[in-house]
């Protein structure tokens, strides 16, 4: 201590010194006690406050623990739900993948089916075009058949005209034979009779002219020859019958026309030879007896009313046969003009 080595001048001074020092220490002790008391009060208050805070903290801790437990339970439930959702999502994803694969397969099948439909459509369009072309060809052939029918009807009309001319020539031949017989009876003393061979040939020509054609046409299902225009028309078939004319029937019809033309030409030549023979035997004969046939001119040609001479009639008939037909003709058949010219 610093005061232990201090020296005093007197005892009173030392007593005062120690009294002052004691008072100082006493004051310090009182101050320290006061501070201790204040500190204790403050510590008690602080302790109470800490206890209060501790209680609050414990309460809060309990609340937090309960909340933690609740959150853990919720977490477990959420985990379970997540696992369930995950498994459900996986199943849905698997199902969607299967559906996607199935949809892709269906899409491929549909694309294949579309390609097949397009190919079938192309085939149908080609078949349609082929059908249209076949229909056009059928219409063309139908028109050709109609033209052939019209041409054959014109041929039938010409055949009827030929039959009428043959009948007229037969009548004229019969009249000429009768006239020749009468003139032979009148000129018997000075005109020799024609030979039996010539008469026989004339009769045979006339009979051949009136006989049936050498190439008959038979209708389907019929075995008899066609000798008249009606049977010939039935044999060829009308345009509305629907049966097309065969090439053999066309050739037969042309053969009939050719036979008729040849027979008409033979008959005309026979008539001309008979007239020449008759006029050579009697160059200066008078007009014939009144048999209702008109008069003859100085050349010996019969000029009956409403009729022409046999030679003129034959020439006119030849010219009439040589005229082209005004009816429609088929490209597959030769024209009547060419046939008549070839036959004449």
From Swiss-Prot:
Residues 1-93 are annotated as: Self-association. Keywords: Cell cycle, Cell division, Centromere, Chromosome, Coiled coil, Cytoplasm, Cytoplasmic vesicle, Cytoskeleton, Developmental protein, Differentiation, Kinetochore, Lipoprotein, Membrane, Microtubule, Mitosis, Neurogenesis, Palmitate, Phosphoprotein. Pfam families: NUDE_C. The lineage of its organism: Eukaryota, Metazoa, Chordata, Craniata, Vertebrata. Residues 208-230 have a biased composition (Polar residues). This is Nuclear distribution protein nudE homolog 1. The modification Phosphoserine is found at residues 211, 282. It comes from the Eukaryota. The keyword Cytoplasm applies.
